[in-house]
Amino acid sequence: MFKFNEDEENLKCSFCGKDQDQVKKLVAGSGVYICNECIELCSEIVEEELAQNTSEAITELPTPKEIMDHLNEYVIGQEKAKKSLAVAVYNHYKRIQQLGPKEDDVELQKSNIALIGPTGSGKTLLAQTLAKTLNVPFAIADATSLTEAGYVGDDVENILLRLIQAADFDIDKAEKGIIYVDEIDKIARKSENTSITRDVSGEGVQQALLKILEGTTASVPPQGGRKHPNQEMIQIDTTNILFILGGAFDGIEDVIKRRLGEKVIGFSSNEADKYDEQALLAQIRPEDLQAYGLIPEFIGRVPIVANLETLDVTALKNILTQPKNALVKQYTKMLELDDVDLEFTEEALSAISEKAIERKTGARGLRSIIEETLIDIMFDVPSNENVTKVVITAQTINEETEPELYDAEGNLINNSKTSA
């Protein structure tokens, strides 16, 4: 240990300037000295910077209200689902932030989320927008492509590979990402009774997903596909990955209705019919998911269930026009680049919405309807300098007339004849 000569003049810390008799220790280097207090301070600074680097994406965690405000900019309606998601996601990342030395014995467990709603109700968009809000890696998987290990199809580890790829192979980032698994209802057991036949895309897949949902160190093939002996693997801890599971769960209303009917004493079971579809879904319970075909262990790992409502004409019209990246704004901008104004009448917006409801595609089908309507316009207009404005009417959407084309003076330059 370094010792100072007694006749040597009083030494000072080269960083804070304190004399050696003012501190407990003074460590000497090549012409410099540092005291124990400065060493402790430097150590704290390094630890803080390391902590910031490992949780860079969530250092400034938005509040549930801020998360919901951001969701409102891109997702129309579904207020209850957005509130449930905002609280669940906030609590999830708050839990990650507090990981480290425990001051007490309370351990915060992860709560994955299930989104139940019809096709086109906004399940995928909600999950995508959440990931953007929090600046974390995001991956989408389809449960119908998954099978048990040893059968043709994707292993569940391939879901993790997509997240790793979204994080540019930064494992630390991937371990704090979000994975959305769609069509989760399609891996429900075919009946509540176990069967001697193999259900390679049902209960077996639930068991495989269960491992990564609850938190495990998974071995992921870097090139995807099946695992092979002697293959180099990527190791990833799924403990802090948030899983959002989505599904339409067609027919689950009947399951809920049966449960409610059984509990109505002194009334006929038809009494449960007074509930409309949305009111029924609002009363969904874990036992309903089990009756539908999800195993109890799987349900236990997804404690938060948010119900999304079927979108009506008004909601679909709002989706077309109100969000920051609304479809009408996108196509208007597209034609604007060719110096052409695009206008949809109110009746046209209603017709688009009604057609999406007819097709049972919800918001997901809006883009294809607009694309079908505008394909000829987007083909012809760039080579027709006379056109400065295009008006889309309800008749255009219903394929009764062509879009109305106008020149710079406001003159109609096509006759809007009934389409052949």
Curated annotation (Swiss-Prot):
GO terms for cellular component: HslUV protease complex. SUPFAM superfamilies: Glucocorticoid receptor-like (DNA-binding domain), P-loop containing nucleoside triphosphate hydrolases. One of its GO terms (biological process) is proteolysis involved in protein catabolic process. Zn(2+) binds at residues 13, 16, 35, 38. Residues 1-54 form the ClpX-type ZB domain. SMART domains: AAA, ClpB_D2-small, zf-C4_ClpX. InterPro entries: AAA+_ATPase (IPR003593), ATP-dep_Clp_protease_ClpX (IPR050052), ATPase_AAA_core (IPR003959), Clp_ATPase_C (IPR019489), Clp_protease_ATP-bd_su_ClpX (IPR004487), ClpX_bact (IPR046425), P-loop_NTPase (IPR027417), Znf_CppX_C4 (IPR010603). Keywords: ATP-binding, Chaperone, Metal-binding, Nucleotide-binding, Zinc. ATP binds at residues 118-125. PROSITE patterns: CLPX_ZB. One of its GO terms (molecular function) is unfolded protein binding. ATP-dependent specificity component of the Clp protease. It directs the protease to specific substrates. Can perform chaperone functions in the absence of ClpP. Component of the ClpX-ClpP complex. Forms a hexameric ring that, in the presence of ATP, binds to fourteen ClpP subunits assembled into a disk-like structure with a central cavity, resembling the structure of eukaryotic proteasomes. NCBIfam families: clpX, PRK05342.1. Belongs to the ClpX chaperone family. This is ATP-dependent Clp protease ATP-binding subunit ClpX. It comes from Staphylococcus aureus (strain bovine RF122 / ET3-1). The gene is clpX.
